[in-house]
Amino acid sequence: MSSVEVVAQQLLAAEHPRRMGKGAAADPRRAALGELTNLNAVAATNGKVGPSKKPSKASCAQKPKPTELVAPMIQTGAAASAPVSAKPCVKEEQLCQAFSEVLLAVQDVDEQDADQPQLCSQYVKDIYKYLHVLEEQQPVRANYMQGYEVTERMRALLVDWLVQVHSRFQLLQETLYLTVAILDRFLQVHPVSRRKLQLVGVTAMLVACKYEEMYTPEVADFSYITDNAFTKSQIVEMEQVILRSLSFQLGRPLPLHFLRRATKVAGADVEKHTLAKYLMELTLLDYHMVHYRPSEVAAAALCLSQLLLDGLPWSLTQQQYSTYEEQHLKPIMRHIAKNVVLVNEGRTKFLAVKKKYSSSKLMKISLIPQLNSSTVKAMAESLHNP
């Protein structure tokens, strides 16, 4: 046989593999299919290692046989795995659907701020998540003055005086909140005598001014405001003690930061915002509220404000952004209501905050009739009789 005839036969065999006598082209095709469909395992179970008969001439009756063998194996494999994957898929779909429904009910309050870079709409959610973490890292313990020479009444007297000093110096709102935060954080780790309490107070305000204000009052001004009870050197020395005790960590979030965010989320007007500020400032004098986080105080103040002015409940959107449900805020709202009743009924001498918010500049918000309503009184009474 010539080499030309050999090549011709090879070409013919390549074009018509079934015409070859020993089925050489059929076996690899079946072996590959067997690897995918576990036909090898079935063949081993039946005791068949390979084809026992020579493949006969291809006919119409023989063509469907491989299909009949392969199809049941594929269907059986799918059917066997279907019960395992069906339940997780259904459960996952239900969870996704429920989560989507919750998200659809929550309004994206930052959606309209994309063209205003100063509002940081892309990062504002992350910023407030960080503030929530930060306030937990710098807590104030409940009843931290237990066993101290300084009492809660002395603390209230000092804070009431600091509110007046703050107004006298015309300082930023943040400065007052930071002053009280520094005061409480310092006193819980460094007890002082009654004689030095006022020194700690004015020094805390000096530190807060340096942190918040553009133009800080001089040390001599703080010495003068104490009627020269403390010298400039004493104030500077106490400043060093406070900063070392706090490890120079002054960036504790303030209730005012969270209130501004909560007001935006609620779409509250100026009256609701101002009333919430008044309610928050009353809490500065309350020793029994020092352990509440700033975000909790802000949320509770706005929740009570919108309840008194418009009778509005705490919405799902407010719950989502504040991370607090209304049920969680109710105990804090009772404390706030108690403080309102105390100043309205003249059961306390510390009235600097009420006088401050009775000015026309602050809408005379402390004089509105809603603060004398039965709702406020009922909340205050429920604090002692839950």
Swiss-Prot record:
Residues spanning the signal sequence: none
Annotated region described as Disordered, given as residue ranges: 45-64
InterPro entries the record matches: Cyclin, Cyclin-like_dom, Cyclin-like_sf, Cyclin_A/B-like, Cyclin_C-dom, Cyclin_N, Cyclins_cyclin-box
Protein name: G2/mitotic-specific cyclin-B2
One GO MF term attached to the UniProt entry: cyclin-dependent protein serine/threonine kinase regulator activity
BP terms from Gene Ontology: cell division; mitotic cell cycle phase transition
Subunit structure: Interacts with the CDK1 protein kinase to form a serine/threonine kinase holoenzyme complex also known as maturation promoting factor (MPF). The cyclin subunit imparts substrate specificity to the complex.
Keyword Transport: no
Purpose: Essential for the control of the cell cycle at the G2/M (mitosis) transition.
Native source species: Oryzias luzonensis
Keywords: Cell cycle, Cell division, Cyclin, Mitosis
Family named by the database record: Belongs to the cyclin family. Cyclin AB subfamily.
